[in-house]
Amino acid sequence: MNNKSSESITLCAVGDVCINRKNPKSIFDFTMPTINKADISFCQLETSFSDRGSPLPQNRLHFRASPDAASALRYAGFDVVSFASNHCMDYGSDAFLDTINTLKENGMLPLGAGKNIDEARKPVIIKRKGISIGFLAYNSILPVGYWADGDKPGCCPLRIYTLYEQIEPEQPGTRCRIRTFPMAEDFEAMKQDIRKLRAEVDILIVSFHWGLHFTHADLAEYELEVGHAAIDCGTDLVLGHHAHILKAIEVYKGNVIFHSLGNFAFDYSRRATTPEEEARRLSFNPTWKYDPEYAGYTFPVDSRQTVVAKCLISDKRISRVSFLPAHINGRAQPEILSRDDKRFDELVNYLKEITIQHGFDTKYAVDGEEVIVWP
């Protein structure tokens, strides 16, 4: 679809959202005006909204919130909510289906999850000012049984194989190279979905729950293969999340890949309860230490940086991609940073550093309180 339009629309996208507090709307006290202002807003959901179910044993951490908390997402201004998450089935299929229904009842469009695989693969299409925007979502962080199949509920899978390749075969016990690649069946289904949707919409956005959590800069090998394939099949913008930390922004063939948008609004106040757990956290990220001033948000220091991705769509194409630097405070509330806040430059410099570290040549240009992403 390529008929020109004189209209322009804006899209905002953020990473992981997990609300579990007495006053759910308060988590968006500082960002609701920004999210609401966009014509379309997207987020990734990391919790169930249900009073039913029991924790499934195949996941270490389990997230569930009251159904009433879902209204906070609509209050904030979100339209499209990906539920293709490694926590989507934490409390079983009843809680999973409750969440999908609750999102719909609150006026939002769930994505990447459904009562069967066909529903989980189904795109969301939104029209604004004569411009059609299509969304697809896939999950590669998959506890056993969390993916949809046949008539089984779950999220839309993009399963990944991991191989450990010995670098020096003649040296037993030396470090290995970690190789990752997508399962052929899921990968082909994803490409078919994108090609089909490409013919139906003006703008196509694909969301991936993927990557290496908490680790500074590192990207998994499969992210590059999958992200590039998505664009080769017709995707205009890739939104990545799950890592709970910002990752590099890549420009591939003129299209932007946010490898990780980081956390956005995430209630998490769990402290390490054993020396072993403390050591495990530090092995992921050396900044993961308990800070009493951040008792309501006990993620690593690096996880306090986040962004609101912005996309300007003009003449039925993406004409500009940018982001708003933001900081997550000790009450787990994201705050948009002003240009004169020193944390603004710290975040931009952090992204520049990890972008260079991964070998991307993406350029960042500050424009007021936005940062434009340049190829």
Model-predicted regions and their roles:
Residues 1-375:
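Acidic, metal/ion-coordinating pockets
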